[in-house]
Amino acid sequence: MPGQDTRPPPPRKKLARRPGFGFAEAAMTSNRVFRWSGVTGLALLMGTAANCSAQTNADAADAALRAGRHFLAVPVYSAEDDQRVLKLFEGLRVADVCDGMDKAGLQNIGLMDPDIRPLWKDAREFKHRVVGIAVTARYVPTQDPPAGARDAASFNRWMGDWYGRKSSEPFVPLLRPGSVLVIEEHGHDVGSIGSNNILSWKRRGCVGVVSSATARDTDEIIAEGVPLYFKHPGRGIRPGRNEIESVNAPIVCGGVLVKPGDVVVADGDGVIVVPRGRAEEVAAYARATLLEDKAARTRLYEQLGLPKDKSVD
């Protein structure tokens, strides 16, 4: 057509690719427009998503750690396995088990401070002796204020609420025949253990209680015949003084680590804790020690004309 420009369009300018980028640049008026190239652009997108995901995971891990975490594993053992292990330790003394720990390469491990002692002893039948499987609980001092002056009804409501919400006994369902309740506590004058609850624990099969702190109603506990190993009497109630922190987690009692499922042996010499994973080996060494001791003392009894007692039978 007359006046029409029939010249071919100018060739499109080739765009230089920037090193390290997967897109091309084009000049379009005053704006910069980016065009994604297939593989490189997808990789960049995926990398950005991965970075976001990694940051999210890191934030979640940080939040979980700040909320508290136990790093020591707590294996769960069946009641049948507990009974099998307890038979291996039946009749063994703390001295025998201590020697067994030495022979197993566990010298100075598991021996609680000697100030954790039996509340009472039976020198004839040795009913104060304990061989059991650890169930653990940890009580900590409270940061909340005490009740203050109240009338009896108001105080009882406050006390019941504290027992229910803050200082309960959630370990009770875990107690079964052969259990030893081991309590970590730091109160100086609080009777977390008393003549009532210790009997209820015994009813569930608990064969004894070990505490790093105190107990009250000690005269009644002696009369009841429940083995108790502790530091000294404490007189106050738990409300206003302590709170339950954990149940069946690793604790420290008498200066030693106690894990749920460990074997606890206690007598007039104190308390020793055997790691569950080494229990069979330690029991075998300890049994040999006991048999040798009984044989030697039996001969001495006979030479001295002493009547046999339960320690050599």
Language-model features: where?
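Structural motif
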Residues: 108-110, 133-136, 146, 179-182, ...
